Amino acid sequence: MSYQENNAMPSIMDALVPMVVEQTSRGERSYDIYSRLLKERVIFLTGQVEDHMANLVVAQLLFLESENPDKDIFLYINSPGGSVTAGMSIYDTMQFIKPNVSTVCMGQACSMGAFLLAGGAPGKRYVLPNSRVMIHQPLGGFQGQASDIQIHAQEILTIKKKLNTLLAEHTGQPLEVIEKDTDRDNFMAADDAVKYGLVDAVLNKRD
């Protein structure tokens, strides 16, 4: 993954973020669409899971908890996955804060995205009908001295065991089934993700 320097020109997507204008007693106030939805306790987790994105999601979760610790937070996920450590910082915060975090998959939730989807509050994990969910084992590649490669290989096995154990808890599947099903890329349609226990229901239309 490549990163742009801080002084790089903004991307087209950055330039095209819609703005919402509201009338208040003090006049007009404008928000970008994501900030406006944050007021409604909606957080978007989109794209690669990496440290910068994880920090933003964690900050929003903590902010919404401070605003109202008893009201649900809605986390919309459209992600191909990414860094395990970045994803675990989001996961641990979801479990730590007092509000229930309802997760919704739109588009795709793969790898760490699927793990975070399953980590939502029980009974409040959803998938849109044409979304795809994919689980697999952690990926890694290392270079260097043989002893260092051995250390990193052991770390990957430790992470794999931890992720599989947590996924078994969230899905209700036996650990042996999780280990077998995550050995290779395992794609699921919306209904299959419900049957597997990664989510609780398919959302076709808002009530």
Swiss-Prot record:
Disulfide bond entries: none
Key words, A-Z: Cytoplasm, Hydrolase, Protease, Serine protease
Principal subcellular localization: cytoplasm
InterPro entries: ClpP, ClpP/crotonase-like_dom_sf, ClpP/TepA, ClpP_His_AS, ClpP_Ser_AS
GO annotation, biological process: protein quality control for misfolded or incompletely synthesized proteins
EC nos: 3.4.21.92
Catalytic activity: Hydrolysis of proteins to small peptides in the presence of ATP and magnesium. alpha-casein is the usual test substrate. In the absence of ATP, only oligopeptides shorter than five residues are hydrolyzed (such as succinyl-Leu-Tyr-|-NHMec, and Leu-Tyr-Leu-|-Tyr-Trp, in which cleavage of the -Tyr-|-Leu- and -Tyr-|-Trp bonds also occurs)
Top EC class, one word: hydrolase
Active site positions: 111 (nucleophile), 136
Cellular location(s): Cytoplasm
Keyword Glycoprotein in annotation: no
An example molecular function term from Gene Ontology annotations: serine-type endopeptidase activity
Domain of life: Bacteria
One Gene Ontology term, aspect cellular component: cytoplasm
The protein's role, per its UniProt record: Cleaves peptides in various proteins in a process that requires ATP hydrolysis. Has a chymotrypsin-like activity. Plays a major role in the degradation of misfolded proteins.
Family: Belongs to the peptidase S14 family.
PANTHER family: ATP-DEPENDENT CLP PROTEASE PROTEOLYTIC SUBUNIT
HAMAP family to which the protein is assigned, alphabetical: ClpP
Assembly: Fourteen ClpP subunits assemble into 2 heptameric rings which stack back to back to give a disk-like structure with a central cavity, resembling the structure of eukaryotic proteasomes.
Name under which the protein is recorded: ATP-dependent Clp protease proteolytic subunit
